[in-house]
Amino acid sequence: YSYLYTTELLCAYEEEYDYLNDYPYFHILSLGCGGCADLMAFEHFYRMHSFVAPISYIGIDVNELWRPINNRTLKYCENNGINYKVRYADVFKCFRQHIVNDTNVIVISYLISYLYNTNQIGVIDSFLEDLVTNIVQKKNKGQKLLLIINDVNSYKRGRTYFSQFIRKLEKYKLSIIKCTYKYFDTGDLFDGQKIGTPHLVKRSLFSIPEAIQRKYHAESNCKKTIQLMLEVV
């Protein structure tokens, strides 16, 4: 699914081009980073628009099976001037003990559905509390921050919890200057799944090699995914 995940997040970055255009640097924090599809998408977006601001990336994931892929990504980043780190830790415990300063892009992709699927959805409120107090509030005063939530367009498993991000930011008097919902229209959505406006993209924006398609039965059609982009100052 890396091709589709990268496509989804590239669409999110493109939606936020005007907001990101004058960033003096990009300090990306990815919660539940996996194979870092969000960084792949960002690097493509960055090159497409000829950005020159420095990039740093911190990924957090509990699953060390991603390590071989992350190690290859590290080598690529070292050769291309990207400061890249991955920490293998439980996201939901990590920020009770650690503060991250000056982050200005936060990506949370398929983390809510992971909580639901593993019967941990009850921790979402405390997770959001830690996210806001130990990460979002630690940005520089007046600094722009983009929060991207990308998840399953399904009741309870994804979009149901998006509004909690907004309420938690408002609780701590952070200013949300823009709130954007986007979804991928698979042609068979219920009205309740059509929140915001659809992306025009229907298929992977990246060519999937035939060998990978055969070996992994890789699909190129976009899935039922919904996104919330929050511009915060």
Where are these regions (language model features)?
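Active-site catalytic pocket residues across diverse enzymes, especially alpha/beta-hydrolases
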Residues: 14, 46-50, 74-77, 119
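Conserved SAM-binding motif I beta-strand of class I
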Residues: 56-61
